From Swiss-Prot:
InterPro entries: Calcineurin-like_PHP_ApaH, LpxH-like, Metallo-depent_PP-like, UDP-diacylglucosamine_Hdrlase. It comes from Sodalis glossinidius (strain morsitans). Keywords: Cell inner membrane, Cell membrane, Hydrolase, Lipid A biosynthesis, Lipid biosynthesis, Lipid metabolism, Manganese, Membrane, Metal-binding. It is an enzyme of class 3 (hydrolase). It comes from the Bacteria. Its EC number is 3.6.1.54. This is UDP-2,3-diacylglucosamine hydrolase.
Length: 239
């Protein structure tokens, strides 16, 4: 059996086609897998496990159905949903993982992560990331009224869009030295990540590979690891 990896689905109520496509993926492709790993940005925004958004319940039910069939599901936080907590994970039946995880899949030593920590040339983003990952600041934010959290999140997203519009594509992409440092430190032969929305499988020195997941904007994207190797799949939301 194969292990599946996805990232950057960016689920939100404003994009029902993406939601339908992801639910179809869970019922068809994921149900035939040995395990499913979601490498961040499952949701476009996450302001707390107490958000009563009906979409969150719908996704929790679908993921719970998958795990109840004996297919484990694991989650690494992204830059959009880094506040997703234990309460929602329990509702989904998924297991929360640290920001970086090393695993052995058959003969492959694989390191998985969301990918934003590899974009070390984007100094502004890395400073922002360090700030919002401070525990005290997260606790303060989650203590605010829900509607205030939503307004803050909307403002932060708008600021991010404006900031990214002034950055070059190279700055927002991964840093090759950062990639090699992670692979050297972990001894991994394969790296799988998302975040950049640039799906591809890159050959690296020393017979190593970096597999990048695509975003679920107009089609689905998944990486499959099996005895046949590492494969990138892109498919229609109904396929």
């Amino acid at each position: 059996m194969s292990t599946l990896f996805v990232a950057d689905i960016h689920l939100c109520a404003q994009e029902p086609a993406i939601t339908a496509g992801f639910l179809h993926f869970l019922r068809t492709r994921a149900i035939a897998a040995q395990a499913l790993y979601i490498l961040g940005d499952l949701f476009e925004v996450w302001i707390g496990d107490d958000d009563p958004n009906p979409l969150h319940h719908e996704i929790a039910v679908a993921l719970q159905a998958l795990t109840q069939r004996g297919i484990p599901c694991y989650f690494i936080h992204g830059n959009r949903d880094f506040l997703l907590g234990k309460r929602y994970a329990a509702a989904c039946g998924i297991t929360l993982l640290p920001a970086q995880r090393v695993m052995q899949l058959d003969e492959l030593r694989v390191v998985i992560l969301h990918g934003d920590t590899l974009c070390t040339d984007d100094n502004d983003y890395q400073r922002f990331r360090r700030r919002v990952h401070q525990r005290w600041l997260q606790r303060l934010f989650l203590s605010l009224p829900l509607q205030l959290r939503l307004r803050i999140a909307d403002r932060m997203r708008a600021n991010s869009l404006r900031a990214n519009a002034g950055k070059t594509a190279d700055i927002m992409d991964i840093n090759a030295q950062a990639v090699m440092a992670v692979m050297d430190d972990t001894g991994a032969t394969v790296m799988i990540h998302g975040h950049t929305h640039r799906p591809a499988i890159h050959q690296l020195p020393g017979e190593r590979r970096r597999a990048v997941l695509g975003a679920w904007h107009h089609q689905g994207s998944a990486i499959e690891v099996s005895t046949s190797g590492v494969m990138l799949h892109e498919f229609s939301f109904g396929g």
